């Protein structure tokens, strides 16, 4: 049977480790997929590469992309704009490839509205103390920003009910293993393969 590409949306509070988990999936080739690189107006963090981690653009360039309907979703978070280029996502899914989006909660909500067939995974910290430790360990945000992110995380965790799966990022290895299990299960989900079998039984 022809296997359709999955749109896998990985989301969760800032500092929960979405980027780290995504990088581990990429590095260890846990399952074959195409990663959709997001666009942002924020400045690169140490070690981040333009075109690999994000497309780093100016606010003017970002607004032009919005005007040209080139983004699947976009929003502003802590003074910076973030968005997902639409064209590459559509092309990869049409080619039957699995696509991974790593986006924030607001972005995931918009994608859910436009592509409800996606698989939505909420990555959550073991607790808020761990989340604070991770944000402090970054060394890139002030105490005021960290407090703001924690307050936002309290609200975002409550929208977990809108997702298909919840994965606790206690360790990166555990989180990656859970995500792989989700992908494997989704590929054999009846709702994803039933149309192929309906076609099969109608054939002569």
Swiss-Prot record:
Belongs to the guanylate kinase family. NCBIfam families: guanyl_kin. It catalyses: GMP + ATP = GDP + ADP. ATP binds at residues 12-19. Its main location: cytoplasm. Essential for recycling GMP and indirectly, cGMP. InterPro entries: GK/Ca_channel_bsu (IPR008145), Guanylate_kin-like_dom (IPR008144), Guanylate_kinase (IPR017665), Guanylate_kinase_CS (IPR020590), P-loop_NTPase (IPR027417). The lineage of its organism: Bacteria, Bacillati, Bacillota, Bacilli, Lactobacillales. GO terms for molecular function: ATP binding; guanylate kinase activity. It comes from Lactobacillus delbrueckii subsp. bulgaricus (strain ATCC 11842 / DSM 20081 / BCRC 10696 / JCM 1002 / NBRC 13953 / NCIMB 11778 / NCTC 12712 / WDCM 00102 / Lb 14). GO terms for cellular component: cytosol. Its EC number is 2.7.4.8. PROSITE patterns: GUANYLATE_KINASE_1 (PS00856), GUANYLATE_KINASE_2 (PS50052). PANTHER family: GUANYLATE KINASE (PTHR23117:SF13), GUANYLATE KINASE-RELATED (PTHR23117). Keywords: ATP-binding, Cytoplasm, Kinase, Nucleotide-binding, Transferase. The keyword Transferase applies. It holds the Pfam family Guanylate_kin. It comes from the Bacteria. This is Guanylate kinase. It is found in: Cytoplasm. The keyword Glycoprotein does not apply.
């Amino acid at each position: 049977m022809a296997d359709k590409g999955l749109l896998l949306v990985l989301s969760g509070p800032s500092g929960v480790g979405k980027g780290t988990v995504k990088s581990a999936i990429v590095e260890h080739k846990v399952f074959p997929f195409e990663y959709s690189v997001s666009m942002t107006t924020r400045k690169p963090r140490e070690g981040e590469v333009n075109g690999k981690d994000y497309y780093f653009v100016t606010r003017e360039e970002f607004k032009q992309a919005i005007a040209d309907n080139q983004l699947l979703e976009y929003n502003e978070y802590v003074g910076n704009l973030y968005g997902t280029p639409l064209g590459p996502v559509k092309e990869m899914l049409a080619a039957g490839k699995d696509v991974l989006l790593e986006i924030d909660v607001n972005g995931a909500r918009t994608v859910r509205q436009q592509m409800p067939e996606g698989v939505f995974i909420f990555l959550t910290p073991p607790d808020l103390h761990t989340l604070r430790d991770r944000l402090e360990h970054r060394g890139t945000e002030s105490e005021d920003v960290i407090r703001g992110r924690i307050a936002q995380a309290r609200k975002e965790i409550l929208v977990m009910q809108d997702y298909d799966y919840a994965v606790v990022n206690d360790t990166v290895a555990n989180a990656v293993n859970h995500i792989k299990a989700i992908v494997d299960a989704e590929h054999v989900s009846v709702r994803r393969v039933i149309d192929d079998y309906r076609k099969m039984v109608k054939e002569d």
